[in-house]
UniProtKB/Swiss-Prot annotation:
Biased composition (Basic residues): 1-10
Biological process annotations from GO: tRNA 5'-leader removal
KW Cell cycle (keyword) present: no
Segments forming a coiled coil: none
Organism: Kocuria rhizophila (strain ATCC 9341 / DSM 348 / NBRC 103217 / DC2201)
Protein name: Ribonuclease P protein component
GO terms assigned for molecular function: 3'-tRNA processing endoribonuclease activity; ribonuclease P activity; tRNA binding
PANTHER family (alphabetical): RIBONUCLEASE P PROTEIN COMPONENT
Gene designation per UniProt: rnpA
Any single Gene Ontology cellular-component annotation: ribonuclease P complex
Length: 113
């Protein structure tokens, strides 16, 4: 579970991260990363209706939240992250989703630096 201080809540934060951050995309997810100094890392999720019904979207969000908690533990400060789930994420097995997520984050962070 992500602590409140690590959750992205306002649309302004989402917009800033997506527009000015670096992007890394894979089959199941697209990740936008913006590096910032001194602030706690924050994570936000975008799971549209194209992914599936409400039950499916919530399942995808729970899975992505668990992966993001791992990222925040590794880097508790200095990174804003927006994770956008693509429709194939609804049926992706856990290991494939985890591999795509980690790879997309690594690509986006590398492009930021």
């Amino acid at each position: 579970m992500l602590p409140t201080r690590h959750r992205m809540r306002t649309s302004a934060h989402f917009s800033t991260t997506v527009r000015s951050g670096a992007r890394g995309g894979r089959r199941n997810v697209v990740v936008s990363v913006r590096l910032s100094t001194g602030a706690p890392s924050r994570v936000g999720f975008v799971v549209s209706k194209a992914v599936g019904n409400a039950v499916t979207r919530n399942k995808v969000k729970r899975r992505l939240r668990e992966l993001s908690a791992e990222t925040v533990r590794e880097r508790p400060e200095g990174m804003d992250l927006v994770v956008r789930a693509l429709p194939p994420a609804a049926t992706a097995p856990w290991d494939e989703l985890a591999r795509d997520y980690r790879s997309a984050v690594a690509t986006a962070v590398r492009r930021c630096a």
